[in-house]
């Protein structure tokens, strides 16, 4: 953001860190070049990027960079704004005011294209006694640089479902099948 240059922002954050007013500094949605600029001024402990099984743009450069630099990743939107819940199918309409209403990713054409993939992923999850949500969160947790996954629950059952994403994992051949489905 040109209004808040990285150098100026990170200099201020480093001053707060040195004064003991903040212990750790994290950034959100930075690319590798931005993190390099920031690291030249101030240590960074975490990055909060958009990351899900359907949006894996960070895997090529950001994920390896953060692992090398010891920066913990705290992914947001791990369920792709609800796409990885399996609830949204062609014909679904969001109410006025919902941020997903009118977004291309939720149009019928995209939902139609995703449906077979989501069904196949759901079948893999169910074979392990898990849900698509749990598989989707677990996939991110298996990345060494991911410190935790930022999920939100509207009710206790959703929170319980999210907790069930940890403490298990697919076999290598199952992950290979997940990769094949997502290609």
What are these regions (language model features)?
Residues 1-182:
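Beta/alpha (TIM)-barrel catalytic core signal, keyed to glycine-rich beta->alpha loops juxtaposed to Asp/Glu
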